[in-house]
C-alpha cells in the first residue's frame, strides 16, 4: 500500500508516502527520529510498540516498512500530541494498522497481555535543569516523567524473547543507557554510531537490545560527505522517506 505525497504543506514534515503535522507537539520531526525509524530491524516482526509516540512519526515509518499484517501500538502521555498523532495516522495509508493510546506507558503496560517483537522509542534524555517554555516541552525533553530505568523495565515487561528494543540517544548518554541495560539483563545486539561527517566524532548512537543473548553487530554511519551532500550510506538508509532523495 503506498501513497505518493508531492505537495509540501505547512506546520509539518512531508515525506514520500505520508505527512506529519507537528505544530501541536513539543518535539518536532528531526533527524534523530528519522534515523531510528529507518534503522530499526523489522524483519519478521508481527507486532510493534512505539513508546512516547509524539507526532506519530516512528509508528508511521514502521508501518511503511512492514507488511500489511503488522500491527503497531503507539503510546503517548501528552494529550495534544496524542491527538495530533491520531490525526496524522488517520490521514496516512495505514490508519487501520496503527493504534494510538493517550496514556502513561507504565500504567498502560500493566493492562497488556500481548508481546511485541519490536519496541521503539526516541526517549527524553536531559536531566532536570533549565525550565522549558511549556510543560509539554519539558515532558518531552526531560526524564522526570519516565526515567531510563523505568523505560527499560516497561520494555522488558512486554517484549518477546527474541524481540528488539531500539532507541536513539546522544553518544555519551547512550553509553550510560547501555551500561544500565546490561545491568538489568538486556543484551546489546546492534549499535550504530552516527557522525555528521568523517572528521567529526559521533554525536548520536542507535541501539538495539534484546532479552536474548547473541552477537553484537556495530558500525558507524556518516550523515554527510566532504561536499556536505548526504552520504551514500545515509541516502540508502533514508531515501524511502525523504521527499527529494
UniProtKB/Swiss-Prot annotation:
Biological processes annotated in GO: methylation; tRNA processing
Keywords: Cytoplasm, Methyltransferase, S-adenosyl-L-methionine, Transferase, tRNA processing
Pfam families reported in the protein's UniProt record: MTS (PF05175)
Keyword Endoplasmic reticulum: no
EC class (word): transferase
Gene3D superfamilies per the UniProt record, alphabetical: Vaccinia Virus protein VP39 (3.40.50.150)
EC number: 2.1.1.223
UniProt-annotated location(s): Cytoplasm
Primary localization: cytoplasm
Catalytic reactions on record: adenosine(37) in tRNA1(Val) + S-adenosyl-L-methionine = N(6)-methyladenosine(37) in tRNA1(Val) + S-adenosyl-L-homocysteine + H(+)
Protein name in the entry: tRNA1(Val) (adenine(37)-N6)-methyltransferase
Name of the encoding gene: yfiC
